[in-house]
Amino acid sequence: MNKEILFPNMSRSLHLFFLVFVVSVLFHAHDVNATTYVTFNDGRLYVFPDTCLQMMTQDEGQISFTAQDGTVYSYPLASIASIEEQLSKELPTFTSFKFNNKYNYQVITDAVGTITDDKVNVTVAGIGKRLTSSFTLSDENARAYVDGKEQESKVSRLRFDNNRTYVVGYPGDMILTAQPSGKYSMLPFGRTYTVNVDYLTDHSTSVPRIDINTVGSVNITSKIEYVDAEIIIDGAGVFPSMTDSVKIRGRGNTTTWSSNPDSKNPYRLKFASKVKPLGLTKGKNWVLLANKAKGSMMTNAIGMKAASLIGTPAVNHMIPVDLYINGTYKGSYNFTEKVGLSNNSVDLEDETTAVLLELDKYYDEAETQKFKTLSNSIPVNIKHPKFDEDSTMLTMTLIKNRFNQFVTCVLTGNDFSKYVDMDYLARYLMANEIILNTEIIHPKSLFCYNANLLDDSSKFCFGPVWDLDWAYGYNTTNVTYYVHNATADFYNWPLAQRYFIRGLRYGADTGQRLFGLWKDFMGDKLDELCEFCQDYYRYAAPSFANNKAAGLDNTNYAAQAVQAAQWLRQRANHIYEKVKAECVYPGDVDGDGKISIADVTLLINYLLSGDADSINMDNSDMNGDGDIDINDVTSLINNLLSEN
């Protein structure tokens, strides 16, 4: 029989006659395991595998396909261009597939996939299994789908802990498919690919090892004087290895640093030229964080993951390493970038007009590098420029004046949006609030920068996020993490300097911006953060065991990984409900702070026209079901009548 039914030169009536004839032939000659391909006049292709069908019928100019669950799909024969039992249409393909580190915070180097027939294999070096794929297709009109959902290159994010099935096809092409529930539905049709991701961390038995051997085996006892050394990094099969010369000294404050060389101290590393240790972005200056407090080994890694998901600037990477100095094991550390104006931290085009400030009660810079604000005497360290070292066009007076203007505006309750990047501010506050990082309230380690202080329109940007071991409910009373204070009010924390942070949170339009960020975060991003607790623990566990064996920390980190995810989820849900209650006023469609007949009119106009520019979508969803329909209009009218 004729496998392709297409009669482009026939009249409409003759075309229909032959379609009816061929359909009749198909009914009688249909193979048990055949597939029927229906092409419509508009170019859409619908595919019906025989294994999914009870029957196929034709009556009164209609063709109907009855699925195994009884669902009937009927189409007018007049809308059909052809019916075939073989696919004559060429399907689009993947031409490239990779995980670009630009869109994947945890992927150290681009992971390029190998495409062989219907398989894509990718090897990834990085901690965490949710990834954003970058791909190209053979036809610009084609699309890629996973589980029926269109995937956007460089945007869509999935968890790749198991094989993922992609469908590459054209919009509108569908296939009848059996669902796990026993139901049948139409899903995108196209070429099917199986994407397999091999994580190097799954095969590792240890984290990277860093050996630092000082010249003459001298001890490192100063936070000021550098010691010359050789550094040997073994990437342990996951990250690149390297050997180089380096300068090393101590770092940190009085609670983290000890002049006793046997202590688990934090260190600062400085290379003669820019290098890429462990494959990270090139830079001269790096840090070894000791995570000295009991139970703190995952605090910085989890916090930086949160910051990356929320989108704060210049997020640090936290790679667990085992550190040896002059052959002696020092413990499990985090290797990370040093916060500063540099291409591996805050990367700016011109540093001569830029300033990086740290609000910190330790106030430990030289007198020429620090000041206190006129309002509230907030201690400010000028981290860049170093006036006696850096090339700069700025002066101490200019820096003080500009920052004082900003702080005074905040503390007097005025609109400070002309001084600060409001988007970065909201992201910075959210990242610290979700982990309850009370350090920034003191303030300690609160960084902000301005790219061009000579330009009055250049704004202060809050970030990078830093120093996250006094967070997650940990304090001098509750010396445990991820147990206490999951519902604590961050902005009413009992510290005298909280008024600056409160002013930032409750001033300008910060609240509405936070609500938008929280709406975006709840769901996949929160899931990814909670999953990361387990992903990070699994990779770092051998190092935690080494640290414990050395008598440095006996915390049960397997249990803590579970507690951390639970604590974060509880806290996120609590904060989101508070922010939503603050920002959503059901019925206030026009956002003027009250409910009136004008709101009813706007909502009806939206339903008729689809024009959402003049309405507040959140306030319009009266019943909170995620859809705006006639039920919301009814609820709004009832509310309005009850108020009157």
Predicted regions located by residue number:
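Internal "kinase-insert"/substrate-recognition segments embedded within catalytic cores
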Residues: 212, 270-276, 290-292, 311-316, ...
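Acidic, divalent-cation-chelating loop motifs in proteins
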Residues: 435, 584-590, 617-627
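Middle-to-C-terminal accessory/interaction subdomains
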Residues: 256-258, 262, 383-442, 446-451, ...
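Alpha-helical segments with a strong preference for the paired helices of cellulosomal dockerin domains
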Residues: 46-60, 72-84, 592-614, 625-644
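Regulatory N- and C-terminal appendages and interdomain linkers associated
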Residues: 91-106, 182-245, 538-584
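Conserved oxyanion/phosphate-binding beta-strand-loop segments in alpha/beta enzyme cores
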Residues: 227-290
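Bacterial N-terminal signal peptides
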Residues: 15-26
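Beta-rich interaction/scaffold domains
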Residues: 36, 40-203
